[in-house]
């Protein structure tokens, strides 16, 4: 089944480093690629590189612009890789292993646990800040949303600063201007 899926999606078994590495060339979300293939539509592959010096990628842009697809592509391919599956990337790509993959995607509000969207995100960020380290991959969609924009942006920047200090790796999507400026003015 693994070999069939690899053939179907163009997956390869790249050389894997024991250290965290994300230097992917022409990476494709395999499920999206299969769906588009059935519709005879092309997929836009992505090149993504995270390094020791630039280990967190902030993605911003308009709604329906591909931010979440990029984030989910990174998450799915990294998880597939760590499960021993072939992944659809170029043979020139470099891949590595993370000890933890932490995700905050979607709306996790809970009536049973009395959690709003924002408090759910805050709880996730608290857990991520506590557990993240230099071998952690963080995947966060719409960072800091669910509250008034100035407060959400300030909270997201404070949390991002902690992730940078802990040398965690990550892909984070946002609409907040302050996080875009943070990315331009800070290392990491």
Outline where the language-model segments fall.
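ATPase nucleotide-binding head domains, primarily ABC-like/P-loop NTPase cores
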Residues: 9-11, 17-188
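Extended, charged alpha-helical coiled-coil/arm scaffolds that mediate oligomerization and mechanical coupling
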Residues: 1-4
């Amino acid at each position: 089944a693994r070999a069939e899926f690899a053939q179907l999606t163009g997956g390869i078994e790249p050389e894997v480093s024991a250290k965290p590495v994300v230097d992917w060339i022409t990476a494709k979300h395999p499920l999206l690629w299969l769906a588009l293939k059935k519709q005879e539509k092309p997929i836009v592959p992505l090149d993504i590189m995270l390094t020791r010096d630039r280990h967190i990628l902030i993605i911003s842009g308009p709604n329906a612009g591909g931010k979440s697809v990029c984030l989910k592509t990174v998450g799915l391919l990294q998880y597939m890789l760590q499960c021993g599956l072939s992944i659809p990337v170029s043979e020139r790509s470099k891949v590595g292993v993370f000890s933890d993959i932490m995700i905050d995607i979607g709306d996790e509000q809970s009536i049973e646990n009395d959690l709003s969207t924002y408090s759910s995100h805050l709880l996730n960020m608290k857990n991520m800040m506590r557990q993240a380290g230099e071998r952690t991959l963080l995947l966060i969609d719409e960072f800091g949303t669910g509250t008034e924009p100035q407060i959400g942006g300030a909270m997201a920047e404070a949390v991002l600063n902690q992730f940078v200090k802990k040398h965690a790796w990550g892909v984070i999507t946002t609409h907040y201007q302050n996080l875009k400026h943070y990315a331009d003015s800070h290392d990491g």
